A protein has these predicted regions:
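Cross-family detector of peptidyl-prolyl cis-trans isomerase
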Residues: 1-281
Length: 281
């Protein structure tokens, strides 16, 4: 009987040691192992591959938005529509001219035109309605994003309504949708804290520089309108389209979820209101 008791307690002790070891190993992994950040693979027609590491620790909503759109195929076939040498290259607009915005259908990959969604403020939205995300940078009161916009940094593009009124700063800050830009130099660090940096090129920076050096023309204000040599329009539209053939993101098994959505600012509605008029689309 004594021998049986000794065997029982020996087995119990061994089991306790094993359990404690497993729990200890799990805790050790939790506190010491870093989850891999998402890695973007971007294929650009006639130019090559660019790989980007995303930083959810700096701009979680921007990362959620980019990962979702990319893996839904939103960026496949879009252009780098704006290229400014010694500054940046900008893309991600489905219209290809800088005026487009993603919709809930793009975010949820839905073909159901009757589907309904909600903005963060709980207002109803249709599948075809556009959305924006909150600007995650210091000027907008978001203190966690300390990423500097140096060479290779990827950031969310946004509108600047303050050119129409200084009172529209918040509307400008929260106007990002799908468009992004990649910095090609360290000479514009004044942008740090004013745009949401959310990633960095880790491979293929030479591809970015090759795109930076493409021949550009002035952007036309209307389809078919010729630009003038004396025009004040920015010379930033590539003469030959620079097409992103595919974008995919490896999240290493992490589900980042969908971003919080904001109803886009309606500039025309605001403008009409300045003159006491009602605007109808």
């Amino acid at each position: 009987m004594k021998d049986f008791s000794k065997i029982f307690w020996s087995i119990a002790l061994i089991l306790v040691i094993i359990i404690l070891g497993v729990l200890g190993l799990g805790y050790y992994k939790k506190v010491t192992l870093k989850t891999s950040n998402p890695i973007v693979t971007m294929e650009i027609q006639n130019y090559g591959t660019v790989k980007i590491e995303l930083y959810p620790e700096y701009a979680p909503e921007a990362v959620k938005n980019f990962v979702t759109l990319a893996n839904n195929g939103y960026y496949n076939g879009v252009k780098f529509h704006r290229v400014v040498k010694d500054f940046m290259i900008q893309g991600g607009d489905s219209k290809g001219d800088g005026t487009g915005s993603p919709t809930f259908a793009d975010l949820y990959k839905s073909d159901d035109e009757n589907a309904t969604y909600k903005y963060t403020n709980n207002k109803d939205a249709k599948s075809t309605d556009p959305y924006n995300i909150k600007g995650e940078f210091i000027a907008n009161g978001y203190k966690n994003n300390t990423l500097n916009l140096t060479e290779g940094t990827v950031a969310m593009a946004r509108a600047d309504y303050t050119q129409y009124s200084p009172a529209l700063a918040e509307e400008s800050y929260n106007s990002a949708g799908s468009q992004f830009f990649i910095m090609t130099t360290n000479n514009h660090t004044n942008l740090s804290g004013n745009y949401a940096g959310f990633g960095k090129v880790i491979e293929g920076m030479e591809v970015v520089h090759n795109i930076e050096n493409v021949e550009c023309k002035s952007a036309s204000t209307e389809e078919g309108t010729e630009s003038s040599e004396n025009s004040n329009a920015e010379v930033s539209t590539p003469v030959t389209d620079v097409i992103i053939t595919s974008v995919s993101v490896d999240t290493f098994g992490v589900n980042y979820g969908k971003p919080k959505t904001i109803e886009p600012f309606n500039y025309m509605q605001w403008l009409y209101a300045q003159y006491g008029l009602n605007y109808t689309e």
